[in-house]
Amino acid sequence: MSQKILFIDRDGTLIEEPKSDFQIDTLEKLRFEKDAIPTLLKLKNFGFKFIMVSNQDGLGTPSFPKENFEIAHEKMLDILKSCGIEFQDIFICPHFENENCACRKPKTAMLEEYIKHELYDKEQSFVIGDRESDMILASNLGVRGLRYGELSWKEIENEILSSFRSASYQRTTKETDIKVKVCLNGGKVSIKTGIDFFDHMLEQIAVHGGIGLEISCKGDLEIDEHHSVEDVALALGACIKKALGDKIGIARYGFALPMDECLASCAMDFCNRPHLVYKAKFKKSHLGALSTEMIEHFFYSLSYAMGVSLHLKVKGKNDHHKAEGLFKAFAKALKMAVKIESENLASSKGVI
């Protein structure tokens, strides 16, 4: 099973690297980089595993005795363990660069088992290091590299936590071909379904939900809009669910009451027990090319694809405003529910 893994360099990234001899061979030289420990603790709580990958030039030679290295190295590991941080594996290359060995970073021989058996999730794993060789290693592993020094540990934390809340999803049937991209932390908005009013409503989800949203839909509109609206809902719901991953840390619940001359409300729970309560009446049969009866069907399909319990209701005079109010209320509730506000799962059962 592939895991979310951080491949972490040691000297100059996790702990300070002495500029005098580039060796940490005494306890006096052992100092942690700022915010390294609290960042790793937080990332651990979001399900990341840690692997140390380090080049130690000449380790075991008279210029760098192994026993001297191990004194500081073991102390470092003891400190990390006392804080709740342990490495799943530790890989150290002891060779000089001119020895042209197979294991020295950025080569990947030390990580061959992880590559061969696909033990890491390429989309959700990272290399963290302070040298160009670390960035080349990231490329060789097919993951993203984050360069410490250019980024602080807190900035690295933000980069990682934001990037894994994105997803892409494609749904292709005989009636439709739909592509969806979602970034729950914001981003580009581009929506083209062939139904202008529906595009306008979907834009409300992106803008008022604070999410990046790209949707393209090619559907059988020559028949009617039913398949396009339904399948967009299914694809969007599946994509949001995929972007949330294990849901650790999310608020889980959302509630919103935007008001104009109409009153629209939405209550949402990411409980994985899909259900829709929908209370809305429209005087018109269509808004633009969108049938008003398809609005309920959209939210029904969306709630089941997302795995949420969803309560929507609206009252007012203007049908356009009522429809827009429903989508805005949903967007605001979604923004609240997916916000990361802790490091735990919002469930006494331990699962959502």
From Swiss-Prot:
Region of interest: Imidazoleglycerol-phosphate dehydratase: 165-352
Chain positions covered by the region annotation Histidinol-phosphatase: 1-164
Residues binding Mg(2+): D9, D11, D130
Required cofactor names: Mg(2+); Zn(2+)
Listed pathway(s): Amino-acid biosynthesis; L-histidine biosynthesis; L-histidine from 5-phospho-alpha-D-ribose 1-diphosphate: step 6/9; Amino-acid biosynthesis; L-histidine biosynthesis; L-histidine from 5-phospho-alpha-D-ribose 1-diphosphate: step 8/9
EC number: 3.1.3.15, 4.2.1.19
GO molecular function, one term: metal ion binding
Active site feature: D9 (nucleophile), D11 (proton donor)
One CC-aspect GO term: cytoplasm
UniProt-listed GO biological process terms: L-histidine biosynthetic process
Binding site for Zn(2+): C93, H95, C101, C103
Reaction(s) this enzyme catalyzes, per UniProt: D-erythro-1-(imidazol-4-yl)glycerol 3-phosphate = 3-(imidazol-4-yl)-2-oxopropyl phosphate + H2O; L-histidinol phosphate + H2O = L-histidinol + phosphate
Classification via PROSITE patterns: IGP_DEHYDRATASE_1, IGP_DEHYDRATASE_2
HAMAP family linked to this entry: Bifunc_HisB, HisB
Protein's name according to its UniProt entry: Histidine biosynthesis bifunctional protein HisB
Species in which this protein is naturally found: Campylobacter jejuni subsp. jejuni serotype O:6 (strain 81116 / NCTC 11828)
Gene giving rise to this polypeptide: hisB
